[in-house]
From Swiss-Prot:
Known catalytic reactions: D-erythro-1-(imidazol-4-yl)glycerol 3-phosphate = 3-(imidazol-4-yl)-2-oxopropyl phosphate + H2O
Keywords: Amino-acid biosynthesis, Histidine biosynthesis, Lyase
Name of the featured protein: Imidazoleglycerol-phosphate dehydratase
Domain of life according to the entry: Eukaryota
Amino acid sequence: MASPLPVRAAALSRDTNETSIQIALSIDGGELPQDADPRLLEASSAHASQTSKSQVISINTGIGFLDHMLHALAKHAGWSMALNCKGDLHIDDHHTAEDCCIAVGTTFAKALGALTGVARFGYAYAPLDEALSRAVVDLSNRPYTVVDLGLKREKLGELSCEMIPHCLQSFAQAARITLHVDCLRGDNDHHRAESAFKALAVAVRWYD
């Protein structure tokens, strides 16, 4: 009988002067890790959530559009992920958006664990209507990011458009990966941003 595959999951609590974050992530979907903070699955606080046989996703950052992007990332990467953040949104969105993506990247790296048997390089294209994005990833342990989304609006919902590339940079830095993300075409900034997160999601779907 074949040995069961190792569980690729991790949970993290991250507290700073600006944010308090709890996150749990299972790269292969399914149930969240047993040491996940129970507060993560409080349905009343989840702004972007779904539950199925293969995935559990519950995201509450306090920023609706960021919830939407992280939900898209988890869904299309095949992850189960729960994240809750209380941040200093009375100041602006910077600390919350940055710290949430640092937490996602850190937890992803922890859950992925040893890279033996995992493809080092991943890439994907993802469309959303008229928008098309490309993501290329290298599990290099040398964090580096190039992001070109061509966003023109000041904000999408309550998330500053300048923070969207920074979110991708923060994820890559914490995950210790090299990441290139480009939106190749598109008229709608919502579509451009979402297709970028979906391309990243598909690019990081590594399996043993």
